[in-house]
């Protein structure tokens, strides 16, 4: 009997305490994690702007700006992205959104101060209106003035997610909406004649705001909105003592719009001489629409195999548009206690893009705190036409 058990009189059973096992976080791969309320060193390392261990990242002088990465993670796909990767460290992608199943209303708050009149707050509220339906609303907000002139950063990550499963446990739905705005002022760094004072250690220059920057009239913004829907229907579910076999069909719809914009009221020769214009206002948009149809076969002995067909429409909103691309492929996932094996293949069928993508990975769990991952990516890509 769990914390959702209800008497026939529709009254909730009294003196039935919710257990920590009744609070579950579900990721995009349907892996379930129990909510962890313990206070550990690992949790301390995640008490930051990215809400993750940033051991391999060197933060800039103000929270909310970019990072210098000391590691290299190769990421390949069949389609080029918008670029502006330096602004994407805090941009929540589809795989970053979690779903919840909770026995009672659940709240999580994270607060820490930032640089000079700076505050960072991440708030999440989740509730199950019934054992089968949950909705979660969350927002992370930052505003940090920074130690240097004209280096303010401000960001907002709003997300709303729901998940539902039918009474007969055959239909499953996950959906989310996110709205993100990442803004930062740019100053080009301090001037060359201030470098000696910066490095001197003189107490007169401990206050970094005394240094004059290269310019004080530039800023950039990354803004994005995404709607995501993932639904599955379980056609067959065979259970026995030795093997569990399932067959399901599914559909995924993703609609995302994002843009990156850099503005400077008057151009500056620090980056080189500009010709033909005095004011800079560069903006590029990136719209994507994805429809996925898939069918999955899973077995506790053989793992899960998924065959899929994708339709993509990608619009860069300037001279080049890539549209009406169809692709097909398969995913394979096999999990055991000590390792996880995954394989992905996707190839284009029609459209302006020709190519294929192969990914293979092996994750070895050494112990509860350590793991090793091996991954190999192979990509073939060619754009045959642009208009």
Question: How would you describe each model-predicted region?
Answer:
Residues 105, 119-123, 156-160, 225-229, ...:
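Hydrophobic, lipid-facing positions within transmembrane beta-strands of outer-membrane proteins
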Residues 86-87, 111-120, 145-153, 317-326, ...:
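Solvent-exposed loop/turn segments connecting transmembrane beta-strands
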Residues 123-127, 137, 160-164, 229-235, ...:
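Residues on the lipid-exposed face of transmembrane beta-strands in outer-membrane beta-barrel proteins
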Residues 97-104, 131-132, 167-173, 236-247, ...:
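Short loop/turn motifs that connect adjacent beta-strands in outer-membrane beta-barrel proteins
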């Amino acid at each position: 009997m769990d914390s959702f058990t209800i008497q026939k009189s529709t009254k909730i059973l009294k003196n039935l305490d919710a257990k920590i096992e009744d609070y579950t976080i579900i990721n995009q791969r349907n892996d379930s994690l129990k909510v962890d309320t313990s206070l550990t060193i690992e949790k301390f390392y995640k008490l930051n702007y990215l809400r993750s261990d940033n051991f391999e990242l060197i933060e800039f002088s103000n929270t909310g700006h970019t990072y210098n990465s000391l590691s290299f993670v190769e990421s390949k796909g069949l389609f080029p992205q918008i670029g502006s990767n330096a602004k994407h460290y805090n941009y929540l992608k589809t795989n970053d959104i979690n779903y919840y199943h909770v026995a009672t209303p659940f709240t999580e708050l994270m607060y820490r101060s930032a640089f000079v009149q700076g505050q960072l707050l991440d708030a999440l509220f989740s509730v199950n209106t019934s054992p089968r339906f949950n909705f979660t609303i969350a927002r992370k907000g930052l505003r940090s003035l920074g130690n240097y002139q004209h280096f303010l950063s401000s960001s907002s990550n709003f997300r709303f997610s729901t998940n539902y499963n039918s009474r007969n446990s055959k239909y499953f739905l996950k959906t989310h909406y996110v709205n993100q705005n990442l803004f930062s002022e740019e100053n080009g760094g301090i001037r060359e004649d201030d470098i000696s004072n910066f490095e001197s250690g003189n107490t007169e220059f401990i206050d970094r705001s005394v240094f004059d920057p290269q310019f004080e009239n530039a800023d950039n913004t990354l803004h994005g909105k995404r709607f995501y829907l993932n639904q599955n229907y379980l056609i067959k579910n065979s259970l026995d003592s030795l093997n569990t076999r399932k067959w399901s069909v599914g559909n995924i719809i993703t609609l995302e719009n994002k843009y990156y914009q850099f503005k400077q009221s008057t151009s500056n020769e620090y980056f080189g001489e500009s010709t033909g214009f005095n004011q800079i206002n560069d903006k590029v948009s990136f719209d994507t629409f994805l429809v996925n149809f898939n069918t999955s076969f899973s077995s506790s002995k053989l793992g899960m195999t998924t065959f899929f067909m994708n339709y993509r429409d990608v619009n860069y909103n300037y001279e080049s548009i890539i549209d009406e691309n169809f692709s097909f492929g398969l995913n394979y996932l096999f999990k055991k206690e000590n390792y996880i094996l995954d394989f992905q293949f996707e190839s284009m069928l029609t459209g302006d893009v020709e190519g294929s993508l192969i990914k293979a990975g092996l994750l070895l769990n050494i112990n509860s705190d350590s793991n090793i991952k091996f991954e190999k990516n192979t990509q073939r890509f060619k754009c045959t036409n642009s208009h």
